[in-house]
């Protein structure tokens, strides 16, 4: 623990096309080897495809997909007297977004479609329809938290 003041989280610049900080964060998570312009072009073309499929604006469709993947509870390991318990804890709003975006990108990378933009568009549209690998991941996390509800009193 730091003995001096706690440094706050840095603000990131909103993305140039839509002016959204959430989308800028998503592009940063999508980025590989510091190639931001490549990540931006992949994200924008995926959002364009998603908007055409859903009939909503790009940001609206992205927000819906993200909302369906955001976890509300997760489990954290807590060691008590020689045994480790999986303790369910509520997820902070910033971490909710980070986890949802990370899961969507991971699921898109595992898909077998041709281009990354298409994989990402398919994963986002699946997430918007409440199906797909990223939504399944959220369901698994919620199921783990539900199964370990008995250890909720070990929260710290």
Swiss-Prot record:
HAMAP family: Ribosomal_uS7_B. Signal peptide: none annotated. PANTHER family: RIBOSOMAL PROTEIN S7 (PTHR11205). The gene is rpsG. Part of the 30S ribosomal subunit. Contacts proteins S9 and S11. Keywords: Ribonucleoprotein, Ribosomal protein, RNA-binding, rRNA-binding, tRNA-binding. NCBIfam families: rpsG_bact. SUPFAM superfamilies: Ribosomal protein S7. It comes from Salmonella choleraesuis (strain SC-B67). Pfam families: Ribosomal_S7. This is Small ribosomal subunit protein uS7. InterPro entries: Ribosomal_uS7, Ribosomal_uS7_bac/org-type, Ribosomal_uS7_dom, Ribosomal_uS7_dom_sf. The lineage of its organism: Bacteria, Pseudomonadati, Pseudomonadota, Gammaproteobacteria, Enterobacterales. One of the primary rRNA binding proteins, it binds directly to 16S rRNA where it nucleates assembly of the head domain of the 30S subunit. Is located at the subunit interface close to the decoding center, probably blocks exit of the E-site tRNA.
């Amino acid at each position: 623990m730091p003995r001096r003041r706690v440094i706050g989280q840095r603000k990131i610049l909103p993305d140039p096309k839509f002016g959204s900080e959430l989308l800028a964060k998503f592009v940063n998570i999508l980025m590989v080897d510091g190639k931001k312009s490549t990540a931006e072009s992949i994200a924008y073309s995926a959002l364009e495809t998603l908007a055409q499929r859903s009939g909503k604006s790009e940001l609206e469709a992205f927000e819906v997909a993200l909302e369906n993947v955001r976890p509300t509870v997760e489990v954290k390991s807590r060691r008590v007297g020689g045994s480790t318990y999986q303790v369910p804890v509520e997820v902070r709003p910033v971490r909710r977004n980070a986890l949802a975006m990370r899961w969507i990108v991971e699921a898109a990378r595992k898909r077998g479609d041709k281009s990354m933009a298409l994989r990402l568009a398919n994963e986002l549209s699946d997430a918007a329809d409440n199906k797909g690998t990223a939504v399944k991941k959220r369901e698994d996390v919620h199921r783990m938290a539900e199964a370990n509800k008995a250890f909720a009193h070990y929260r710290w």
